């Protein structure tokens, strides 16, 4: 049975009517037309669907809509724009960290959540945090450099 659920998406209040067990990813993509989070594995194992929920990177393909009720959700679209990318997005651009793009949403959203929590992470902390995001092209070195660059950019006055 459908129910109406209220949540915050990219700083805006949203009400969605759907089955409570509908994956949050489907609501974001199909109902709210937010295509930053991607459908990858559908099992929460690849990271392509990562969003930030209340400051924590989370896999939206395995979170039921009911589990997002009243929560603050940020998608890739909520970080920046083409004209003014978020510092993490800009760092990924500057370091040319993308090839096929499969992992970019998950890597960027996970990096943003990490840097919000730990402004100056070690390489080991960055690797540990990003290790659950599947990158098919192997741009791991560029991704690591991008996260380091984003951390440095945030430190500058």
Curated annotation (Swiss-Prot):
GO biological process terms held by the UniProt record: nicotinate catabolic process
Disruption phenotype: Cells lacking both nicA and nicB lack the ability to hydroxylate nicotinate. Cells do not grow in a nicotinate medium but grow in a 6-hydroxynicotinate medium.
PROSITE patterns referenced in this protein's UniProt entry, alphabetically: 2FE2S_FER_1 (PS00197), 2FE2S_FER_2 (PS51085)
MF GO annotations: 2 iron, 2 sulfur cluster binding; metal ion binding; oxidoreductase activity, acting on CH or CH2 groups
Highest taxon above the source species: Bacteria
Entry's EC annotation: 1.17.2.1
SUPFAM superfamilies membership: 2Fe-2S ferredoxin-like, CO dehydrogenase ISP C-domain like
Entry binding sites for [2Fe-2S] cluster: 41, 46, 49, 61
Enzyme class label: oxidoreductase
Keyword annotations: 2Fe-2S, Aromatic hydrocarbons catabolism, Iron, Iron-sulfur, Metal-binding, Oxidoreductase
Pathway assigned to this chain's UniProt record: Cofactor degradation; nicotinate degradation
Cofactor annotation remark: Binds 2 [2Fe-2S] clusters per subunit.
Induction (record text): Repressed by NicS in the absence of 6-hydroxynicotinate (6HNA) or nicotinate inducers. In presence of 6HNA, repression is alleviated.
Catalytic activity, as annotated: 2 Fe(III)-[cytochrome] + nicotinate + H2O = 2 Fe(II)-[cytochrome] + 6-hydroxynicotinate + 2 H(+)
Cofactor(s), by name: [2Fe-2S] cluster
Boundaries of every 2Fe-2S ferredoxin-type domain copy: 3-79
Record function comment: Subunit of the two-component enzyme NicAB that mediates nicotinate hydroxylation, the first step in the aerobic nicotinate degradation pathway. Mediates conversion of nicotinate into 6-hydroxynicotinate (6HNA).
Protein name, as recorded: Nicotinate dehydrogenase subunit A
């Amino acid at each position: 049975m459908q129910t109406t659920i209220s949540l915050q998406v990219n700083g805006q209040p949203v009400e969605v009517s759907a089955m409570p067990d509908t994956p949050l990813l489907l609501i974001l993509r199909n109902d709210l037309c937010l295509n930053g989070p991607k459908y990858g594995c559908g099992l929460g194992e690849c990271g392509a669907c990562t969003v930030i929920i209340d400051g924590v990177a989370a896999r939206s393909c395995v979170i039921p809509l009911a589990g997002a009720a009243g929560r603050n959700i940020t998608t890739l679209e909520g970080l920046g724009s083409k004209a003014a990318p978020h510092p993490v997005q800009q760092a990924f651009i500057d370091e040319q960290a993308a090839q096929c793009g499969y992992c970019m949403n998950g890597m960027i959203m996970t990096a943003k959540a990490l840097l919000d929590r730990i402004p100056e992470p070690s390489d080991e902390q960055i690797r540990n945090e990003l290790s659950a995001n599947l990158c098919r092209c192997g741009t791991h070195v560029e991704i690591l450099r991008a996260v380091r660059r984003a951390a440095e950019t945030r430190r500058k006055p």
